[in-house]
């Protein structure tokens, strides 16, 4: 077994330091980042990995106590999640951001072990496979706060492209002020000119 996970720490620092904070998915501000175990699940390509890196960069100026690791990294071919958690803990780590947990066999037991045996450790995990996340969730339901992230709305896409930034409009406002709202928007930009592009590529922000 080759335990030294320095490659993971170097990778974590590089990815978090290089991620942009210019645009964040709306769910970023809706997530409560305080619970000890936080899960984020959703389809591939909707920005889960970026959320983790943005939170590290924004919330941990000193990243010595935080580690981002994708569980499909080759390091896990010869080492276990338990190995990593123990190493991180004895070196003063307090936060783990675990990406692609569904790629790791029995991931749910690994996270349960962290919760039960490392009370000072905080974990945020993501998974793309909805079925596997849900199968494993029964044992985490009392421990993890789960969040669902979907693809970008057309409004998010326009903001992501720098075309138009517009606050969310409630259904009541749409029903009572739809003509006024539509006029305000179209006076700024002809949004339908960009709708085809959104349908082709805008749902998943990984295309940039």
Regions found by a protein language model. Give the residues of each.
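Conserved lysine of the Walker
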Residues: 48-49
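Structural recognition of the conserved hydrophobic beta-strand(s) that form the central parallel beta-sheet
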Residues: 97, 122-128, 148, 157
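Walker A (P-loop) phosphate-binding loop of P-loop NTPases
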Residues: 44-45
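Short glycine-rich substrate-engagement loop in P-loop NTPases that contacts/grips substrate
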Residues: 63-95
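Conserved catalytic/switch belt of AAA+ P-loop NTPases
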Residues: 108-129
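Interdomain motor-coupling "hinge/lid" segment immediately C-terminal to the ATP-binding subdomain
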Residues: 2-6, 11-15, 136-208
């Amino acid at each position: 077994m080759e335990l030294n996970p320095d490659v993971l720490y170097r990778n974590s620092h590089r990815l978090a330091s290089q991620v942009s904070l210019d645009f964040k998915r709306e769910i970023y501000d809706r997530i409560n980042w305080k619970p000890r175990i936080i899960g984020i699940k959703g389809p591939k390509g909707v920005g889960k990995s970026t959320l983790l890196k943005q939170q590290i960069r924004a919330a941990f100026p000193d990243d010595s106590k935080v580690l981002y690791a994708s569980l499909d990294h080759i390091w896990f071919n010869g080492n276990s999640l338990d190995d990593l958690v123990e190493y991180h803990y004895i070196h003063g780590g307090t936060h783990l951001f675990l990406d692609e947990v569904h790629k790791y066999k029995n991931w749910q037991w690994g996270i349960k072990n962290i919760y039960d045996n490392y009370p000072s450790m905080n974990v945020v995990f993501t998974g793309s496979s909805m079925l596997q996340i849900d199968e494993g969730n029964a044992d985490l339901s009392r421990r993890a706060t789960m969040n669902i992230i979907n693809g970008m709305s057309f409004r998010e896409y326009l903001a992501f492209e720098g075309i138009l930034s517009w606050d969310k409009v409630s259904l009541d406002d749409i029903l009572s002020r739809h003509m006024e709202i539509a006029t305000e928007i179209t006076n700024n930009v002809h949004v339908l000119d960009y709708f085809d592009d959104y349908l082709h590529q805008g749902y998943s922000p990984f295309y940039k």
